[in-house]
C-alpha cells in the first residue's frame, strides 16, 4: 500500500528580540510522523523535542534556514518580517513536491496562500495553527525549535543567561538594559528594529545624558 508523504513548513523565533528565526521544511510519511508522536513543538519538553528531532532527521527529508539577527536587522530596514519570511519559504519550497502545508504567518490566510502559490508555482495550504493540524508541519516546528534552541545556547555561552529572548520576559529586558549600559554591541544577537530594543536603547541613552 502506498504511504502518503506529507510536506510541511514552520518557523521558530519569529517574535523574540534576541536570537535567530529558523524556518524548516520536512517531507515524511504521515503515518511515521503519527507513530513517533509529533505535535506542536511548544507543547513538548526540550528533551522530547531533541528525541523527535533525531527521529525526524534520520528518517525524513528536511531542510532549514537560520536567519540571523544581523540578516534580520539588514533586511528589516526595507522589508517587513512577513516579506522576509515569505522569501525564505519560497526558497525552501523549491525542494518540495506535491502539496505543502504551511503554518501561516499572515493574519489573512488566503493572502499568504495566493502570493506563495503564484510565486512558487507550487500547491500550498496556509493555515493558522497548522502545526497542530498537519504532522509534517508539527515535525517542521520541532526541527526549527531545536535548531533555534542550539543557536540560543551559543549566544548564552558568549553573553550569559538572558532568559527566553522574548520581549515579554523581564529577564530578557534586564539583560538588554544592562548590556546597553555597559556599551556592548548587540547587533549580532538582537533585533534592533524591534520596538522593545528601541525603547530600552532610548531609555538607556536618555539616562546616560542625565548624568552629564
From Swiss-Prot:
SUPFAM superfamilies: Ribonuclease H-like
Enzyme class, first EC level, given as a word: hydrolase
Presence of the UniProt keyword Metal-binding in the record: yes
GO terms of biological process kind: DNA replication, removal of RNA primer; mismatch repair
One of the record's GO cellular component terms: ribonuclease H2 complex
Binding site for a divalent metal cation: 10-11, 103
InterPro entries reported in the protein's UniProt record: RNase_H2_suA, RNase_HII/HIII, RNase_HII/HIII_dom, RNase_HII_arc, RNaseH-like_sf, RNaseH_sf
Catalytic reaction equation(s): Endonucleolytic cleavage to 5'-phosphomonoester
Cofactor(s) needed for function: Mn(2+); Mg(2+)
EC assignment: 3.1.26.4
Highest rank taxon of the organism: Archaea
Keywords attached to this entry: Cytoplasm, Endonuclease, Hydrolase, Manganese, Metal-binding, Nuclease
Compartment(s) of residence: Cytoplasm
Coiled-coil stretches noted in the UniProt entry, renumbered to this chain: none
UniProt-listed Pfam families: RNase_HII
Signal sequence, renumbered to the chain: none
Gene3D superfamilies linked to this entry: Ribonuclease H-like superfamily/Ribonuclease H
Family classification: Belongs to the RNase HII family.
Functional description taken from the UniProt entry: Endonuclease that specifically degrades the RNA of RNA-DNA hybrids.
Protein name: Ribonuclease HII
Source organism of this protein record: Thermoplasma volcanium (strain ATCC 51530 / DSM 4299 / JCM 9571 / NBRC 15438 / GSS1)
Amino acid at each position: 500500500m502506498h504511504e502518503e508523504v506529507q510536506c510541511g513548513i514552520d518557523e521558530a523565533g519569529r517574535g523574540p528580540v534576541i536570537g535567530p528565526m529558523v524556518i524548516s521544511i520536512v517531507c515524511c510519511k504521515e503515518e511515521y510522523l503519527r507513530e513517533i508522536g509529533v505535535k506542536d513543538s511548544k507543547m513538548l519538553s526540550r528533551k522530547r523535542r531533541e528525541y523527535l528531532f533525531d527521529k525526524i532527521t534520520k528518517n525524513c527529508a528536511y531542510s532549514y534556514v537560520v536567519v540571523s539577527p544581523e540578516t534580520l536587522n539588514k533586511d528589516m530596514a526595507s522589508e517587513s518580517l512577513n516579506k522576509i519570511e515569505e522569501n525564505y519559504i519560497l526558497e525552501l519550497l523549491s525542494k518540495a513536491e506535491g502539496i505543502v502545508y504551511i503554518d501561516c504567518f499572515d493574519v489573512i490566510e488566503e493572502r499568504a496562500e495566493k502570493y506563495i502559490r503564484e510565486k512558487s508555482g507550487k500547491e500550498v495550504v496556509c493555515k493558522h495553527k497548522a502545526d497542530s493540524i498537519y504532522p509534517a508541519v508539527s515535525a517542521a516546528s520541532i526541527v526549527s525549535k531545536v535548531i533555534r534552541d542550539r543557536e540560543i545556547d551559543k549566544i548564552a555561552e558568549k553573553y550569559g543567561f538572558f532568559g527566553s529572548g522574548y520581549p515579554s520576559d523581564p529577564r530578557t529586558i534586564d539583560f538588554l538594559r544592562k548590556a546597553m549600559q555597559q556599551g556592548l554591541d548587540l547587533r549580532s544577537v538582537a533585533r534592533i528594529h524591534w520596538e522593545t530594543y528601541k525603547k530600552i536603547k532610548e531609555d538607556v541613552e536618555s539616562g546616560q545624558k542625565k548624568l552629564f
